[in-house]
A protein has these predicted regions:
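Structural and coupling elements of P-loop NTPases
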Residues: 1-691
């Protein structure tokens, strides 16, 4: 395999909203790059990147897929990413390791929610962006409207490098603004084209656009700007260097016109990426932490190896497969590298560059490149491996889950298989999280949306043979008291032979929220042997764990065991545990008991037009609006809402906003529940126990 220096590598992610043509654009690139012989299609499940069963059956991308090709003596490392927010972690993880974002826009639908999400994340990461309007051969396309929308959302410096001449069915002609020429494409999906002079009616507009482009390029560099003011133009070489510089500074955002399924306009996109796109050379250093936690620079030109795992896959015939990017030094088969996150050494076996499920073996990789390695023992997504000095790169910036469900295997005895399956799927997709909640006695899975969780359950069945059902998670309500109470409880049991006897006198009072259970004793005299204090405490802890009102954990109570009675023969540990448990129960019921419910902090980011609907829905969920902030064309609504009201809230937000809203949630505090709802919860829990 040919070795490429960093300046000849182009690492980019193809991102955008679902169904905006990302996979088809990648497929067309592979076709003109000679990596495939024919264009696959979404409909017949034959594209290179969507090769997993779930992707083919649903006709959407679910996984990020690395691809590669050569174009104009440059190596393209492309990552085709999912566009639906349920699988956003795949796209965000990919953006973290590339040098450029190619953002697709649907030629009919225009800028959509995940278009904006990807734009914002690429901006946050500081990587250059370019836009590709795809599907211009469809009915009802309105290029000028899409261009206007892109400028409104992303800035007036969005600049059309091309203009479609005959958009809609039969589309096969573009104006190349940079070269001021007409390009006509063959309609056989070959991508072949002919160049000719501009039509007379378009010359004036293209002239104006070309001059505007020169101004953008000049603004990116002081020396070019000075020459532009002096001479009024730039040479072709100055334009070439200036465009690259302008792309890095995002002085302007290039926008291209294509129909990927017809292979129209794709070659010029590749030309532009090859000539002007970002290379690893454009960001030679990345910040890492040394062993003391101090910031250090990792240089592209460094001799010591530093790489990061950005995705883990599990393949049936090879086991785990780790995708990585090299940030410094070289990586070679058979060499050992130190995992600084887990403090272990890993020997690198076979390495491959990939086009979907097709692999080409490589023995060595240089800084700036991307590849995969098989069968690392204990290395996971986001981990850093290095030689020489031990450094750790920042973890990938991935979103927190916003939807949760409880699961249970349909067949008894599948618990061990389920644990293995959940662990494997989490390693492959860190935005999928699972935990065993001992408080509500359920296994809870969390993800980015209903489809995310549904696809995960399908993968558990297909790969591990486990059938599971999704159900609403139980809410971890808590029980406490609002006042003081006391009780005297005698436990006496006689059934022939040794009996049981214990009497416990107890008083309780409320503590501040979050202070937990405090058990004390104030015994005086010899009524109760002090050895039984621990027994009473065990009984109290059992009562607190089992719950009293609704079978929920008891919190924030001070307990004082102040007196009691014992029998010289029949008093024993189990007797005082039982008496302690029942004394606490009676005292609790006399102390104004109540239920507490978890309150969540939520942030909902929506276009201004949808604020009223979202705020009304929050109020209907017993929520409190805590504030609002502007974020560009969006509003961020901050609120506190009971957890019990938030099941499927991610779906509600998408429904209310036409898919343009997103939300995040995190635990805030516990709060007293309204009496009418408390009564319903207690009755429901009692019903569940009776069943």
């Amino acid at each position: 395999m040919k070795q490429f220096v960093a300046s000849d590598i182009r690492n980019f992610a193809i991102v955008g909203h679902g169904a905006s043509g990302k996979t088809c654009l990648a497929e067309a690139m592979l076709k003109i790059g000679g990596e495939i012989n024919r264009l696959g299609t979404i409909e017949d499940g034959s594209t290179t990147s969507d090769y997993h069963p779930g992707e083919r059956s649903r006709q959407i991308s679910i996984h990020s897929t690395p691809l590669h090709m050569e174009w104009m003596d440059k190596k393209f490392n492309m990552i085709d990413t999912p566009g639906y927010s349920d699988f956003i972690g795949e796209a965000l993880g990919s953006l973290s390791v590339v040098d450029m974002a190619v953002i697709t826009i649907h030629a009919v639908n225009g800028v959509e929610v995940c278009t904006e999400t990807m734009w914002n994340h690429a901006s946050k990461l500081g990587i250059p962006k370019m836009l590709v309007v795809n599907g211009l051969d469809r009915e009802h396309t309105k290029f000028e409207k899409v261009l206007e929308q892109a400028r409104k959302r992303f800035g007036n410096n969005v600049f059309p490098m091309q203009l479609p001449v005959n958009e809609g069915p039969g589309y096969n002609k573009n104006i190349d603004v940079l070269r001021s020429e007409l390009i006509s494409y063959k309609e056989d999906r070959s991508g072949q084209m002919t160049e000719s002079e501009l039509p007379e009616e378009l010359k004036e507009r293209v002239k104006d656009l070309h001059e505007e482009l020169i101004e953008y390029v000049a603004e990116s560099d002081d020396s070019l700007l000075e020459k532009f003011f002096e001479e009024g133009s730039l040479t072709e070489e100055e334009m070439r260097e200036g465009i690259h510089h302008a792309i890095q500074n995002q002085t302007f955002i290039p926008l291209f016109c294509v129909s990927a399924t017809s292979n129209i306009g794709v070659a010029r996109v590749c030309d532009f990426i090859s000539k002007y796109g970002s290379s690893p050379d454009d960001r030679k250093t990345i910040i890492a932490n040394d062993e003391k936690g101090s910031d250090v620079d990792v240089s592209l030109d460094g001799s010591e190896t530093v790489l990061q795992i950005f995705k883990t896959m599990s393949e049936s015939h090879v086991g785990e497969f780790s995708l990585f990017r090299v940030y410094s030094g070289k990586v070679s088969t058979g060499k050992d590298y130190h995992n600084t996150n887990r403090n272990i050494n890993e020997r690198f076996g076979q390495m491959f560059i990939l086009n979907g499920k097709n692999r080409t073996q490589v023995d060595q990789l240089s800084a700036g490149d991307i590849a995969g390695v098989v069968k690392l023992k204990d290395t996971h997504t986001s981990n850093t491996l290095c030689s020489g000095k031990h450094v750790t790169l920042p973890a990938l910036d991935l979103p927190s889950p916003n939807i949760h469900a409880a699961i249970e295997p349909s067949a008894k005895g599948d618990e061990e298989k389920l644990a293995v399956g959940l662990s494997t799927l989490h390693e492959e997709d860190p935005t999928f999280i699972y935990r065993v909640d001992s408080e509500v006695k359920q296994t809870i899975i969390s993800g980015q949306g209903e489809l995310h969780l549904t696809v995960t359950t399908e993968r558990l069945k297909r790969r591990f043979g486990i059938d599971i059902a999704l159900e609403e998670p139980k809410v971890p309500f808590r029980e406490t008291i609002m006042g003081s109470g006391s009780a005297k409880y005698r436990h006496k049991k006689q059934s022939g032979g040794a009996g049981q006897f214990a009497e416990v006198w107890m008083r309780i009072e409320p503590k501040q929220r979050g202070e937990g259970i405090e058990f004390t004793h104030s015994l005086v005299g010899q009524n109760v042997d002090r050895v039984f204090v621990v027994s009473v405490e065990k009984g109290v802890k059992t009562a607190c764990s089992d719950g009293i009102l609704a079978g929920c954990k008891v919190v924030d109570v001070k307990v004082d065991f102040y007196d009691g009675k014992m029998h010289p023969v029949d008093s024993k540990d189990i007797a005082f545990q039982t008496a302690g448990k029942h004394a606490f129960r009676e005292a609790f019921l006399s102390a104004q008991p109540c239920l507490l419910e978890p309150i969540m902090d939520i942030e909902v980011k929506v276009p201004e037009d949808f604020m009223g609907d979202i705020m009304g829905d929050i109020s209907g969920k017993r929520g409190k609006i805590m504030g609002m902030d502007a974020d560009g064309s969006f509003q961020v609504i901050k609120a506190q809402v009971p957890q019990a009201e938030l099941y499927h809230y991610a779906t509600t937000v998408r429904s209310l906003t036409g898919g343009r809203g997103i939300h995040s949630e995190s635990f805030s505090h516990y709060e007293k529940m309204p009496k009418d709802i408390e009564k319903k919860v207690a009755q429901e829990r009692q019903k569940q126990e009776d069943e």
